[in-house]
Curated annotation (Swiss-Prot):
Subunit-level organization: Acetyl-CoA carboxylase is a heterohexamer composed of biotin carboxyl carrier protein (AccB), biotin carboxylase (AccC) and two subunits each of ACCase subunit alpha (AccA) and ACCase subunit beta (AccD).
Cellular localisation: Cytoplasm
PROSITE patterns noted in UniProt: COA_CT_CTER
EC number: 2.1.3.15
Entry's Gene Ontology cellular component terms: acetyl-CoA carboxylase complex
GO molecular function: acetyl-CoA carboxylase activity; ATP binding; carboxyl- or carbamoyltransferase activity
Function text: Component of the acetyl coenzyme A carboxylase (ACC) complex. First, biotin carboxylase catalyzes the carboxylation of biotin on its carrier protein (BCCP) and then the CO(2) group is transferred by the carboxyltransferase to acetyl-CoA to form malonyl-CoA.
PANTHER family from the UniProt entry: ACETYL-COENZYME A CARBOXYLASE CARBOXYL TRANSFERASE SUBUNIT ALPHA, ACETYL-COENZYME A CARBOXYLASE CARBOXYL TRANSFERASE SUBUNIT ALPHA, CHLOROPLASTIC
Keywords: ATP-binding, Cytoplasm, Fatty acid biosynthesis, Fatty acid metabolism, Lipid biosynthesis, Lipid metabolism, Nucleotide-binding, Transferase
Enzyme class label: transferase
Listed GO biological process terms: fatty acid biosynthetic process; malonyl-CoA biosynthetic process
Name this polypeptide is given: Acetyl-coenzyme A carboxylase carboxyl transferase subunit alpha
Length: 319
């Protein structure tokens, strides 16, 4: 069993390994095919039933673990499957090109759009290159440049959020991390184009907010959105990181809880077992939601679009 398996996934993976073993027997021993196939079908039914049972009772901490799953799809995975003709744009024109944020122009069906998203890494080398999805000021300045470009070209802005938070290093602070985030918040609130934001994994604090002020804010079913990580909250409140599961429940970090609080617009369903189990199906669901949102936002003129966004921001914090 690989290292990329969460504790609550292990019973499911045990069954799947048995199914794979029996499948290899069928290929090598034709005589026992009938009996083995019957057992395979029984185990598959049991696997589906077990997965449904486990995933229908996930707590907030388990959802947080899924949001960070090593095999969970990242921004570039969705760009590859949802959009056409993606042309990546790099650099902030001030300091450097931050690989923790990717962006560029693409087509959603035939419509030009601007895409901005956090990008994590798969292996050690890429994780370091992408700084684990934690952007420095130059990343947010790059995002700001692309936002303004989208407004100039009058094309919709689509963002994908997946970060544990903005990079907290001394160098990032010296280069103006808080100011870079603040400028993005201000700019996104007044951009004269439709903005659709989707949390696809971790939505961590100001690092997430810096590209998530929009006309529509959606979350994938097993993503999270919070002002601090459960571990960070537990460390501050109880001086004990082991109380992270309690913090996760108390903070209300899950998509369905945030929908109840009217902090997001839609929860996008994931396949049974999570997005990493079926990236294509997740991409189709995400694309469908993006097209629905764009169709709705297209019905508003510029003045109405900005007024609705303003009212949305002003109502945060009200029940």
């Amino acid at each position: 069993m690989g290292l990329n398996v969460l504790d609550f996934e292990k019973p499911i993976l045990d069954l799947e390994e048995k199914i794979n073993s029996l499948t290899s027997i069928v290929h090598s021993d034709k005589k026992s095919k009938k009996n083995v196939n019957a057992e395979i079908n029984r185990l598959r039914s049991k696997s589906i039933e077990l997965t449904q049972k486990i995933f229908s009772n996930l707590n907030a901490w388990q959802v947080a673990q899924l949001a960070r799953h090593p095999r969970r799809p990242y921004t570039l995975d969705y760009i590859e499957r949802i959009f056409n003709d993606f042309d990546e744009l790099s650099g902030d024109r001030v300091y450097a090109d931050d690989k923790a944020i990717v962006g560029g122009i693409a087509r959603l069906n035939s419509r030009p759009v601007m895409i901005i998203g956090h990008q994590k890494g798969r292996d050690t080398k890429e994780k370091i290159k992408r700084n684990f999805g934690m952007s420095a000021p130059e990343g947010y300045r790059k995002a700001l440049r692309l936002m303004k470009m989208a407004e100039r070209f009058k094309i919709p802005l689509i963002t994908f959020i997946d970060t544990p938070g903005a990079y907290p290093g001394v160098g990032a602070e010296k280069r103006g991390q808080s100011a870079a985030i603040a400028k993005n918040l201000r700019t996104m609130s007044i951009l004269k184009i439709p903005i659709i934001c989707t949390v696809i994994g971790e939505g961590g604090s100001g690092g997430a907010l810096a590209i998530s002020v929009g006309d529509k804010v959606n979350m994938l079913e097993y993503s999270t959105y919070s002002v601090i990580s459960p571990e960070g909250c537990a460390s501050i409140l109880w001086k004990n990181v082991k109380k992270a599961p309690i913090a996760a429940e108390a903070m209300g970090i899950t998509a369905y809880r945030l929908k109840e609080l009217n902090l997001i617009d839609s929860v996008i369903s994931e396949p049974l077992g999570g997005a990493h189990r079926d990236i294509l199906t997740t991409s189709i669901s995400l694309k469908t939601q993006l097209l629905l949102d764009l169709t709705e936002l297209d019905s508003f003129d510029e003045k109405e679009l900005l007024n609705r966004r303003y009212q949305r921001l002003m109502h945060y914090g009200y029940c």
